[in-house]
């Protein structure tokens, strides 16, 4: 679900906005068009578009936006953007070019939030300062498009696998267009204590995902 604030940097800090309930298209079966219809019939306010669903859809991004609007749905988030942060400079430039293409696609979709997953690539380095700086740079690019970045810790992330670590990077990056995405699956699968979530400023929690799955051993122990 989206915990939104205005993504327009020209208007300054936004006040509280109502929570909007959404569902990720990866959670539904069928074509993207069928998934949009199902989400609308179930009473959701919006959808999170999964990249794989868009790639296989016969509609263009702009047509997907119109179809969603016709059904009374907002495209609240586009996901996932993988293996971005904590990388060498030459790889960062490539990743920023990749991000620019995503922002252009999101503009056609009408999505204002990009979900960035913690890096799982062997190319990622264990350097929190570098990761925070690179997230700041990505958020600055997002600002230029009137968009924002929701950073999510994957339970299998190479160096960032907890919401606490993700929040430390977001706080260090200190950019208004950068916030955190909290996912119950990734938090509970590693049995992390969720009590520290109350210490994260509400305006920096950009997205909340509630997901269920069989209990598995995610730490290899």
Where on the chain are the PLM-derived regions?
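Glycine-enriched alpha-helix->loop->beta-strand junction motifs that scaffold or abut catalytic
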Residues: 43-45, 110, 173-179, 201-206
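Active-site acidic/histidine proton-transfer and metal-coordination neighborhood
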Residues: 5-17, 33, 70, 85-180, ...
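Conserved beta-strand positions in the central sheet of alpha/beta enzyme cores
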Residues: 48, 77-79, 115, 150, ...
